[in-house]
Amino acid sequence: MKKLVILGSTGSIGKSTLSVVEQNKTEYEVFGLVGGKNVELMAAQCLLFQPKFAALDDENAAKALEEQLRQLNVKTEVLSGQKAICELSAHPEVDMVMAAIVGAAGLLPTLSAVKAGKKVLLANKESLVTCGQIFIDEARKSGAQLLPVDSEHNAIFQSLPPEAQQKVGFCPLAELGVSKIILTGSGGPFRVKPLDEFAAITPAQAVAHPNWSMGKKISVDSATMMNKGLEYIEARWLFNASAEEMEIIIHPQSIIHSMVRYIDGSVIAQMGNPDMCTPIAHTMAYPKRINAGVAPLDFFKLKELTFIEPDFARYPNLKLAIDAFAEGQYATTAMNAANEVAVEAFLNERIRFIDIVNVNRTVVENIAPVQVKEIADVLHIDKLARELAEQAVINL
């Protein structure tokens, strides 16, 4: 049995991961669960999966969890704080770590798993957006296996030759006959909405994604296509791709999850129903296959598959992300932090939908260029960018 730690078990990806475990109980043992403050859900997960450890970032929440588990007679040991979570990620008994904590909070525990040479199922975008070079270098040093969980990157991974799959982060695409990585995106819920109506978009409208079931933050990112911008940055790092080797296409049906174009004219695509359990199951079992509990794709129900070029006037956040990568790691780190603040402000109705990109752009343009050499640099830039973003929100 493979022993698994889930960083972010109470979130959307974490819950989907546990549902895949339920489908394959003889293959996987949940060794540790990590969450933020959701005591009720964590207690329910501990009751169901009986992990050896459960960790919450918040100390008071951890104490409340300990009390609940005692009443439920669950023997799971409760930990709290970043240090304990990092130690759990690197625990010698652990085979694989699902890195699904949203935001900068997931950086250190994910890096801890990478340094320990674990099989790391990477669902935390920020790891590569803010620390791409650091993560790739550490994985090469430790021998950690990085497997992308994001549906698009997982699709690209599956469409690449086996040699490239063994060299995530440093695969020579051109040598393997790859000409383009084609990243697809649905275009979100406002793909055909008139631009003059964007100022009136509400949080409720923005979180209603047409195809995927996701958390609020990532749903807003999908609506602005910042999500695709972050995925562009991730793909550049994961697949060692140049700007010329990248292509972004809007595919509203979300059936083709991404593609790889080869120099002989072939295009290999990965398809399936839009359900995160598929890429989760793929990374958990790789190089084998397991049941993900996902309905098979019914080709006879597909009316059409359409492809559209992205419009940067409609999706300025996408252009901002592409340009930020060209600027360097400091710019992508600052943009990511600013976006977290801006999206939170929008969800709390402090700013309009169209102001999200204005906050992000203000921060990227005003942050001082810094060379990112270690994670302390990343955390410093992240902190500065959040302060700048908060000020930008107030100034709007």
UniProtKB/Swiss-Prot annotation:
Tell whether Ribonucleoprotein is among the UniProt keywords.
Answer: no
The entry marks the following residues as binding NADPH, namely: T10, G11, S12, I13, G36, K37, N38, N124, E126, G215
BP terms from Gene Ontology: isopentenyl diphosphate biosynthetic process, methylerythritol 4-phosphate pathway involved in terpenoid biosynthetic process
**Reaction(s) catalysed by this chain's protein:** 2-C-methyl-D-erythritol 4-phosphate + NADP(+) = 1-deoxy-D-xylulose 5-phosphate + NADPH + H(+)
The reply on keyword Transport is no
Q: Which domain of life is it from?
A: Bacteria
Q: Where does 1-deoxy-D-xylulose 5-phosphate bind?
A: K125, S151, E152, S186, H209, S222, N227, K228, E231
UniProt xrefs under InterPro entries: DXP_reductoisomerase, DXP_reductoisomerase_C, DXP_reductoisomerase_N, DXPR_C, DXPR_C_sf, NAD(P)-bd_dom_sf
Q: What is this protein's function?
A: Catalyzes the NADPH-dependent rearrangement and reduction of 1-deoxy-D-xylulose-5-phosphate (DXP) to 2-C-methyl-D-erythritol 4-phosphate (MEP).
Protein name in the entry: 1-deoxy-D-xylulose 5-phosphate reductoisomerase
Q: Which gene encodes it?
A: dxr
